[in-house]
């Protein structure tokens, strides 16, 4: 509810927002996308850990451009989190199939598939965070959501 109130206050000052969320922050984003689909211009999901259930109303996901960024995050140092990360990864194919089914405008960046390995769950704090930020910026430019780098 506080997140929605914040968005409502923002609407008085700006024409739209690009939301960037990390991990469990994805949990709150669906409600914002559903409630304010014309105000949310795009969503960047970084290592999203809680994606909506496939049987929920996902109509906003068909309207709002989305970028999903995932690293490999498979360190043996984090066994509990490692098991959670594996659970998230197992759900990704079904989520992507659902996005395809509703004709969502989304881009999936799997960093290991792009040859970028060794990231933690905290991509924004890793040594190559400038490279990842560059990928995100390039996507925003490609979508016409920002003018320059």
Model regions and ranges:
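Gly/Ala-rich beta-loop-alpha elbow adjacent to hydrolase catalytic centers
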Residues: 20-29
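Catalytic active-site module of serine/aspartate enzymes centered on a nucleophile-bearing elbow/loop
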Residues: 118, 122-149
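Stable alpha-helical elements in mature extracytoplasmic
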Residues: 3-6, 95, 132, 136
């Amino acid at each position: 509810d506080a997140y929605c109130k914040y968005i409502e206050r923002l609407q008085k000052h700006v024409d739209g927002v690009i939301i960037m969320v990390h991990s469990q922050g994805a949990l709150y984003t669906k409600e914002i996308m559903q409630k304010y689909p014309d105000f949310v211009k795009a969503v960047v999901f970084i290592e999203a850990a809680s994606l909506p259930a496939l049987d929920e109303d996902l109509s906003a996901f068909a309207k709002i451009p989305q970028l999903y960024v995932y690293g490999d995050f498979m360190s043996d140092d984090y066994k509990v989190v490692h098991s959670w990360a594996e659970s998230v990864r197992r759900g990704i194919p079904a989520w992507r199939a659902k996005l395809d089914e509703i004709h969502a405008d989304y881009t999936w960046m799997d960093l290991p598939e792009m040859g970028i390995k060794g990231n933690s769950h905290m991509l924004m704090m890793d040594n190559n965070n400038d490279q990842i930020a560059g990928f995100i910026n390039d996507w925003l430019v490609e979508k016409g959501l920002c003018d320059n780098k």
